[in-house]
């Protein structure tokens, strides 16, 4: 899957789950399961409930995603 195929959406972190997974609520009301991207993990960026984040979704599975950016 190339970089062009991903869907980027903004959302709000609702809860922390084990193994660096998060439940993220999208503006349309859907909730997705998201994990942290490698760059965020590498730079020790903390993600807490209530944070606004950008999530990349695959067009093949819209229930899972990757957190690629945390807004300040």
UniProtKB/Swiss-Prot annotation:
GO CC, any one term: cytosol
Pfam families linked to this entry: eIF-1a
Any one GO MF annotation of this record: rRNA binding
Top-level taxon of origin: Bacteria
Domain (S1-like): residue spans on this chain: 1-72
Principal location class: cytoplasm
PROSITE patterns in UniProt: S1_IF1_TYPE (PS50832)
UniProt cross-references to InterPro entries, sorted A to Z: NA-bd_OB-fold, RNA-binding_domain_S1_IF1, S1_domain, TIF_IF1
The entry's keywords: Cytoplasm, Initiation factor, Protein biosynthesis, RNA-binding, rRNA-binding
Entry coiled-coil feature ranges: none
Subcellular location as annotated: Cytoplasm
Family the entry assigns: Belongs to the IF-1 family.
Subunit structure: Component of the 30S ribosomal translation pre-initiation complex which assembles on the 30S ribosome in the order IF-2 and IF-3, IF-1 and N-formylmethionyl-tRNA(fMet); mRNA recruitment can occur at any time during PIC assembly.
Alphabetical list of NCBIfam families matching this protein: infA (TIGR00008)
Role description: One of the essential components for the initiation of protein synthesis. Stabilizes the binding of IF-2 and IF-3 on the 30S subunit to which N-formylmethionyl-tRNA(fMet) subsequently binds. Helps modulate mRNA selection, yielding the 30S pre-initiation complex (PIC). Upon addition of the 50S ribosomal subunit IF-1, IF-2 and IF-3 are released leaving the mature 70S translation initiation complex.
Protein name: Translation initiation factor IF-1 2
Gene: infA2
């Amino acid at each position: 899957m190339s970089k062009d195929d991903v869907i980027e959406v903004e959302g709000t972190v609702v809860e922390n789950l084990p193994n660096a997974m998060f439940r993220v609520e999208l503006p349309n009301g859907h909730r997705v399961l998201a994990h942290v991207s490698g760059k965020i993990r590498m730079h020790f960026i903390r993600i807490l409930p209530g944070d606004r984040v950008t999530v990349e979704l695959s067009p093949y599975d819209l229930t899972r995603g990757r957190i690629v950016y945390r807004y300040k």
